[in-house]
């Protein structure tokens, strides 16, 4: 096992002693892609997405590329981040290329104006969203959040990979390992069939 001892592919129920040095593989990157792909697909299906106000909640500025895709559907975009400078750089490039712009702030209360909130990574704090807002995220939020929160994504795994999946591993977990450890980045283009909570 060697240097892979902290990235073992195993079912969720399997536990290791704390002092063993062994850890179950985990990466949020593939699930974040499912979340953003679902959000973009949903925006593409709205009759008038330009009427929506979309919030992107990305405190660590890990999904700056998402902004340009969301701006194709609506000009009402508010980015909530603790790393505003990273988004300013991205938005300057977008403004030069397309003329589009978005609001960037660290003030969470701006989310109260949003119809849709895209949070590609797990939400670890209570967010001031409306009761009727739709929130797409990655993993169950650590705090109770108002609105319609969706964090589980159902999709069809490509056949070649489906045949390789060991019994006991979920499709999302196995694809996460293929995407992250196996560099199977084509899996990042999967659009979920549905999302649920």
What are these regions (language model features)?
Residues 103-162:
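Rossmann-like adenosine-cofactor binding region
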Residues 2-34:
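Phosphate/diphosphate ligand-binding glycine-rich loop within oxidoreductases
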Residues 34-52:
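Short internal alpha-helix immediately C-terminal to a glycine-rich phosphate-binding loop
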Residues 11-14, 56-60, 80-84, 118-123, ...:
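Structural motif
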């Amino acid at each position: 096992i060697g240097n892979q001892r902290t990235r073992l592919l195993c079912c969720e129920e399997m536990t290791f002693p704390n002092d063993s040095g062994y850890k179950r593989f985990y990466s949020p990157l593939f699930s974040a892609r499912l979340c953003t792909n679902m959000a973009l697909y949903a925006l593409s299906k709205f009759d008038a997405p330009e009427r929506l106000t979309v919030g992107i909640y990305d405190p660590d500025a890990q999904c700056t590329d998402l902004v340009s895709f969301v701006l194709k559907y609506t000009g009402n975009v508010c980015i909530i981040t603790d790393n505003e400078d990273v988004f300013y750089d991205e938005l300057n490039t977008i403004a030069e290329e397309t003329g589009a712009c978005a609001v960037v702030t660290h003030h969470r209360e701006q989310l109260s104006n949003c119809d849709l909130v895209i949070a590609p990574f797990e939400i670890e704090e209570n967010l001031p969203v409306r009761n009727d807002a739709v929130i797409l995220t990655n993993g169950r939020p650590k705090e109770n959040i108002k609105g319609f929160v969706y964090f589980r994504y159902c999709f069809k795994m490509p056949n070649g990979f489906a045949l390789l999946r060991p019994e006991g591993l979920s499709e999302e977990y196995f694809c996460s390992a293929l995407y992250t450890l196996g560099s199977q980045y084509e899996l990042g283009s999967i659009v979920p069939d549905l999302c649920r909570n």
